[in-house]
Amino acid sequence: MGKFTTIFIMALLLCSTLTYAARLTPTTTTALSRENSVKEIEGDKVEEESCNGIGEEECLIRRSLVLHTDYIYTQNHKP
């Protein structure tokens, strides 16, 4: 019985440390990061509006080019 209890407690400790290590630490949001996210959202709206009057394929090509350039130079991942 004592051996089972010891193994059970060790397993619980191991599982608790693994779940703690797997959690992402919350990042602190500052006013600057909030402003940047608002600018990105506004920038997306401007890009969508700038595709008026051109074909759907041309608009898709332009958006892809902008996203690839952003990825290459800034490494920011946009969903």
From Swiss-Prot:
Alphabetized UniProt keyword annotations: Developmental protein, Differentiation, Growth factor, Secreted, Signal, Sulfation
GO cellular component entries: extracellular matrix; extracellular region; Golgi apparatus
Molecular-function annotations in GO: growth factor activity
Post-translational modification: Sulfation is important for activity and for the binding to a putative membrane receptor. PSK-beta is an enzymatic derivative of PSK-alpha.
Keyword Cytoplasm: no
Pro-peptide region(s): 22-70, 76-79
Localization per record: Secreted
Induction pattern: Up-regulated by wounding.
Main subcellular location: secreted
Single GO biological process annotation from the record: cell differentiation
Tissue: Expressed in roots, mature leaves, stems, flowers and siliques. Most abundant in vascular bundles.
Signal peptide positions (record): 1-21
Sulfotyrosine modified-residue sites: Y71, Y73
UniProt entry tagged with the keyword Oxidoreductase: no
Family statement drawn from the similarity comment of this UniProt entry: Belongs to the phytosulfokine family.
Function, in words: Promotes plant cell differentiation, organogenesis and somatic embryogenesis as well as cell proliferation.
Name under which the protein is recorded: Phytosulfokines 3
Species of provenance: Arabidopsis thaliana
